[in-house]
Amino acid sequence: CPRILMKCKLDTDCFPTCTCRPSGFCG
């Protein structure tokens, strides 16, 4: 998972292999 701060609501908002954390950011 790329170490880039991205806001998200769903895993699909993130890069592949990243998940949407409860914090509202991809990780």
Curated annotation (Swiss-Prot):
Keywords: Disulfide bond, Knottin, Protease inhibitor, Secreted, Serine protease inhibitor. Belongs to the protease inhibitor I7 (squash-type serine protease inhibitor) family. It comes from Sechium edule (Chayote). One of its GO terms (cellular component) is extracellular region. Its main location: secreted. This is Trypsin inhibitor 5. Pfam families: Squash. It comes from the Eukaryota. One of its GO terms (molecular function) is serine-type endopeptidase inhibitor activity. The keyword Disulfide bond applies. It is found in: Secreted. Disulfide bonds join C1-C18, C8-C20, C14-C26. The presence of a 'disulfide through disulfide knot' structurally defines this protein as a knottin. SUPFAM superfamilies: Plant inhibitors of proteinases and amylases (SSF57027). The record marks R3, I4 as: Reactive bond. Inhibits trypsin.
